[in-house]
Amino acid sequence: MISIRAIALFTAIITWLTAVYGSVPIIVNTPRHQRAAMNLCSDASHQLRKGDVASAKRNVDAALRIDPKLWPALYIRAEIFRKEGKYELAIQDCNEALRQYPGCVEASLLRASIKMQLRQYEEALKEYNYLISLHPRPVTLARALSDRAWFQATCPNASFRNGQQAVKDAKAACSIMVWKDESMIDTLAVACAETGDFDSAARYAAQALAMKGISAHDEKVFREHLALFQQRKRIPVTQ
């Protein structure tokens, strides 16, 4: 199944191309170097989803040599930096991607997630709240709601956790995606567990597991969550 992140990025690229070139089909008439850079970005995004970070990095670096301000390349490189633990560099690329194209909401979501990893919890929550207040496209709104739900259900700093709001956000995200996104359903399960509703948590975790096309990694994670909920335990919070 194509990830929500991939769908949102593709949608954003199409929106950007439409704004810049007037219509999507005009891509075939863009300068050769621009087409080459976008093709490299597409390849890098695909390789990153497959876990081939080294190849993704080579392609995105090549794209940025062609056009140092190409926001999709900056966003993808930010994802690579995050995987490498280079959080400050990732944030810099998110900032620049947003400067080049303020509509790249995915860069803002990635930045919020990185801030959570850096324990900048107040800044992360502010970013989620701001994004949701913008009422972005449905797919992007669902992602923002689900990410905020995860934050409020699992934040290592208990003062930022809000189980009831997390459940509300996660249900809204699942509804937007008509209950077809397994990761969002799992987030709802985690949020229910945070409130102590382990029966609902187990039910939603089982629902996420039953989705067709889930990755082996996600299946492993969902099974671990289900086992915890059946024992009436929350997922461990990483300090």
What are these regions (language model features)?
Residues 62-63, 96-97, 130-131, 173, ...:
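Canonical positions in the second alpha-helix
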Residues 160-161, 179-182, 187, 194-195, ...:
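Terminal, low-structured helical/coil segments at or just beyond the last alpha-helical repeat
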Residues 49-50, 83-84, 117-118, 154, ...:
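Register position in tetratricopeptide repeats
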Residues 37-38, 71-72, 105-106, 139-142, ...:
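Helix-start (N-cap) detector for alpha-helical repeat units in TPR-like alpha-solenoids
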Residues 66, 100, 134-137, 176-177, ...:
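Structural marker of alpha-solenoid helical repeat scaffolds
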